[in-house]
């Protein structure tokens, strides 16, 4: 496994959760080093911190996916480590198989890694079930009189409905 972070505490947390006798957790401290490290060690999983120095985590994850799609890099799972819920919007654009929102804990890191390594996904901070994953922000209006049937707000006393798509 490869962890891309310049924060020691993040590497320590991921290593403690995923490292072991049969699993080595390698580290790069700069986003620009992620693709070359992936070419060298061919990790099954790449964990990328959003706030990595030099080249941001989103750019590093996108670069990994582009190299994989071009056939210049072996397939591997990609998990992003996000700082806050609004970062989910950014994470959706980079092709990650999953993401966790900090602060981290070993249990969630293991769950996410197992899901992604098993061919699945792991996403935190998305809307509830049945809602569109591609657009987590529901359409809203500033007009308190507006409803789903009357978005312009004509004084109807019905409850405002969120667009769950």
Locate each region found by the language model:
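Conserved acidic segment of CheY-like receiver
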Residues: 1-18, 46
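Acidic, metal-coordinating helix/loop segments flanking the phosphotransfer/catalytic sites
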Residues: 29-45
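His-Asp phosphorelay/catalytic-motif detector in bacterial-type signaling
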Residues: 42-44, 69-77
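Conserved phosphotransfer microenvironments
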Residues: 44-66
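Two-component signal transduction core modules
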Residues: 46, 99-100
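Alpha4 helix (beta4-alpha4-beta5 surface) of REC/receiver domains from two-component response regulators
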Residues: 59, 80-98
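C-terminal output helix
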Residues: 104-113
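The C-terminal output helix
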Residues: 114-129
